[in-house]
Each structure stands twice: as C-alpha cells, then as structure tokens.
Amino acid sequence: MMRILVSNDDGVNAPGIKALTEALAEIATVMTVAPDRNCSGASNSLTLTNPLRINRLDNGYISVHGTPTDCVHLAIRELCDGEPDMVVSGINAGANMGDDTLYSGTVAAAMEGRFLGFPAVAISLNGKAFKHYHTAAVYARRIVQGLLAHPIASDQILNINVPDLPLDEIKGISVTRLGARHKAEGIVRTQDPAGREIFWLGPPGLEQDASEGTDFHAIAHGYVSITPLTVDLTAYRQLSILQNWVDKI
C-alpha cells in the first residue's frame, strides 16, 4: 500500500490536516507530522540553533516544535518507517496563490519533500469562512490517485488551491500559472498593554495580475487551480542579458 507523509503549517490540531489525513487514509498508509503551533508564513525556514522536540499524540499524529520544513525533513530522515511515496501538505486555511507561495509554510513543506526526492503536493482552501475542507480533501485524494496512476515529471511541486465551495459547485480543475499581488499594505503601529510600541505586518495586497490563466482567475471562477512549481529559482531568460551586462562593467 502506498505511504504518504502529511504535514502543514497551520499546526497539528488544525481542521485542514485532519480532513486531509482522513481522506488520504482511504487510499494509503498515512503518517502525519506537523508543527505543534501555527507556523503560517514560515516559508522554507529550518531550525538550526535549537533541538527539535516531538510529541506523539493519541490520534497517531506527531507534533514537532519546529517549522513545516523541519517536520518534513525530520519525518523523512528519521521518523518514517521507510520512505514515503509522496509528501502532501495542507489543507491550508487560506489561499497560497501568486506571491503567497514565497512565504507559505504549506508550499515549503511540499518543497522540502520534493527537495528530498519525493513527489509533492501542497493544497490550500481559498476563502474566509473555511466551511468546505471536505471539498479540498476530495480533490486532494483525486489528484494523489491521479499521480499514482499517471506519474508526472519529478522536478515539480503541484500547488493546488480550492474554492471554499460545496463539492457540487466546483466547475472543474484548471492548470494555471502564478498570478501576482500588489505590495502588502502598510505596517500597523500600536502599543501593548504596558504602553510599549509594537508593530503588526499589514495584510497582503490585492490581486495585481488575476488575468485568465492565473490561479487567481481560476479560483474566482469556481475552478480548482493546479500550478506546477519548481525548486530551481534561476531566471534562465535573463542569463544572456546578465552576461552582456557583466561584460560591460
């Protein structure tokens, strides 16, 4: 039976990881290893200056006092009883589209799985009420089954976003590119109860590129978006341009 490692960035007690684990357990042996707290926005950070402590929970999950990337790295290198066949991260409470992917711990957990050599999927639920984790879980299971039956290139991570809609209202699956947001809104300056100055990061910016073909466009029109991502961040089209520039200086 296939073995799947599940992780997330919302924390081991988040409803999304429970829905995902239960859905995938119908088709695979699932090991769930996730942060012991919400680590949203952790990106690909690793814990290098402190030990990683784990807690084995009654439901079989393992919580880690570390980041999403820590969780996947530790699980694959030490905790898993044999290597997983796939790493699936989610279900995130909130979209991971466009520029969000640079900050996302959900995407980072999948990326660590891919970096260590395994097929990897990140799945997020777009919305504010988060009523329909079941919808995202059904699509996660469907896509994982598809990857088993029809494997794709191993150098990519599938970044999946699902509208927060009932299952029967989803219009289909759309293959997309990343859209883009405007820059984040301003910093919020305030005081704590002791009168000390504190700051909150402003909310993310609104969509800047939500044109047809983007993940933003697909979600807005009721489609599940799938965007292939790669670990290699090289801007290949700029190499010759940069070389010409270097030759002039």
Curated annotation (Swiss-Prot):
It is an enzyme of class 3 (hydrolase). GO terms for cellular component: cytoplasm. It comes from the Bacteria. Signal peptide: none annotated. Its cofactor is a divalent metal cation. Transmembrane segments: none annotated. Its EC number is 3.1.3.5. The keyword Hydrolase applies. Binds 1 divalent metal cation per subunit. It is found in: Cytoplasm. GO terms for molecular function: 3'-nucleotidase activity; 5'-nucleotidase activity; exopolyphosphatase activity; metal ion binding; nucleotide binding. A divalent metal cation binds at D9, D10, S40, N92. It catalyses: a ribonucleoside 5'-phosphate + H2O = a ribonucleoside + phosphate. Keywords: Cytoplasm, Hydrolase, Metal-binding, Nucleotide-binding. Belongs to the SurE nucleotidase family. Nucleotidase that shows phosphatase activity on nucleoside 5'-monophosphates. This is 5'-nucleotidase SurE. It comes from Shewanella oneidensis (strain ATCC 700550 / JCM 31522 / CIP 106686 / LMG 19005 / NCIMB 14063 / MR-1). The gene is surE.
